[in-house]
Amino acid sequence: MKKNAFYAQSGGVTSVINATAASVILESKKYKSKIGKVYAGKNGILGALKEELIDTSKESKSSINSLKSTPGGAFGSCRFKLKSFEENKKEYIRLVEVFKAHNIGYFFYNGGNDSADTALKIYKACKALNFDLKCIAIPKTVDNDLAVTDC
């Protein structure tokens, strides 16, 4: 069954983070049988928690392509660190509610170490809540300090 994707930016934005966004959006279109719309989170994972999703399918291909040379974070960013599932189960339940409401089955989180940690926490929580979500951490760092990115 076709599922939608959720993409969000996190941490300090770099000069190329929007190029990654454009690539995720454009590449997703190549998998029409698996991926429907790509929603972008307004201000990172907070966009999912607040259900502030940007439907990128409403944008033209040229508009998405222009992201490749647009500095800053087009969708906004955050430095919001999720607590563990045990400490704040309610937050994870909220994420699953939003993902279900928008038929989201893919989560792309673009950021550094904390963002990769967030993607892992969300994956584990979704597994515990019996919700199938493919979580992909997309590395981005100004400091070139990504640790333990291979599992």
Where are these regions (language model features)?
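Glycine-rich oxoanion-binding loops at beta->alpha junctions
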Residues: 51-105, 114-115, 138, 142, ...
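Short, acidic/small-residue loops that bind anionic groups at enzyme active sites
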Residues: 123-149
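Short, ordered loop/turn segments at secondary-structure junctions
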Residues: 10-12, 41-46, 79-80, 112-113, ...
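Short glycine-/acidic-enriched loop or helix-start segments at secondary-structure transitions
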Residues: 17-18, 50, 118-120, 147
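A short, small-residue-rich loop immediately preceding and capping a beta-strand
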Residues: 4-9, 105-114
